């Protein structure tokens, strides 16, 4: 894929308002990641306003991380509001296969037609109805093992599906692309995966979902590579990562993106 940097340039020039319904652990990290990248986060999750706000925001992201009945109402109201307003929305099916409650919630949200689904291999397998071996929010399956399920899920749902791991896989059911950017320190910082969903959302606001998702993954992973060069461990990595997101230029992304057709 050519010119990933153009997607970064467009995202920053529009500074999209990203409505984030995420978990308690991720809120601060996700907001700072989006701000550093050039987007505008809004952590609006209550059912009293989430649906109305989804029509104001340029994009919605929903994370299943810490669901409760009231938050679930907010998720469903926001998804309905985004669809009604013609806004893209991104589903992050955290630990969707872990419990019956999460499986049911995942199925209901899937029926509300997300634009993009971003999860690890075990989450994508579970959401697609295949056998998965997830450990809570962590994956026990490989990205390669989930590629066929991701294609089926994309075909059946109409969403772009991104399976993230050491090498990411993105598909719209017809096309596939792999992203090799990233660093081993990234999974050592909590909520970076959740924050990646926000970045995918920011890139997908007003841009073609398949290409924007791939560009967002490359941007995020390349920032991880840059941060790792300066970091001594997970603590300093977290700070360096925000700086790398902020400092990256479109030309940097064009030079450093590791994308290839699958």
From Swiss-Prot:
Binding site for ATP: 118, 164
Chain positions recorded as substrate binding sites: 43, 191
Single Gene Ontology BP annotation: thiamine diphosphate biosynthetic process
E.C. number: 2.7.1.50
InterPro entries assigned: Hyethyz_kinase, Ribokinase-like
Keyword Metal-binding: yes
Listed Pfam families: HK (PF02110)
Known pathway: Cofactor biosynthesis; thiamine diphosphate biosynthesis; 4-methyl-5-(2-phosphoethyl)-thiazole from 5-(2-hydroxyethyl)-4-methylthiazole: step 1/1
Cofactor(s) this protein cannot do without: Mg(2+)
Top-level taxon of origin: Bacteria
Substrates-to-products reaction catalysed: 5-(2-hydroxyethyl)-4-methylthiazole + ATP = 4-methyl-5-(2-phosphooxyethyl)-thiazole + ADP + H(+)
Similarity field: Belongs to the Thz kinase family.
Function: Catalyzes the phosphorylation of the hydroxyl group of 4-methyl-5-beta-hydroxyethylthiazole (THZ).
Protein name: Hydroxyethylthiazole kinase
Originating species: Cereibacter sphaeroides (strain ATCC 17025 / ATH 2.4.3) (Rhodobacter sphaeroides)
